[in-house]
Amino acid sequence: MDRRHRFALQAEIWVADHLAAQGGLVLARRWRCRGGEIDLVVRLGGVLCFVEVKARGGNSWDSAGWEAVGAVKQRRLLLAAALFLAAHPELARSVCRFDVALVGRDPGGGVRLVAYIAGAFEGSGR
């Protein structure tokens, strides 16, 4: 596993632990299907959150992080979320949200949360 991949995995674990510490229940990590992959599925309060974790080693973020997940990636996440819900019918009536966690390296080489964008995009995939 190369350094970038290792950091991305470390970032996903860190975000899952961070959300769990806030009372979230992590239902799935790196859930894969024919439509793609969902980094994290977390029940946070009464909301089912599909979380995309974006990790960058430096300060290579746009000003608000909005460019981290483009329209193509949004459509893939929407398809993957629909397939996740089909595979878990007990969750099908959940209120769902698509969140993006922007993660960077701290000066010591560890993980730091740059931004957590709850409701980063709507279910339309635009």
Curated annotation (Swiss-Prot):
Record's protein name: UPF0102 protein gll3754
Family annotation (InterPro entries): Restrct_endonuc-II-like (IPR011335), tRNA_endonuc-like_dom_sf (IPR011856), UPF0102_YraN-like (IPR003509)
Species in which this protein is naturally found: Gloeobacter violaceus (strain ATCC 29082 / PCC 7421)
Name of a matching Pfam family: UPF0102
Protein family according to the UniProt entry: Belongs to the UPF0102 family.
MF (Gene Ontology): nucleic acid binding
Annotated TM spans: none
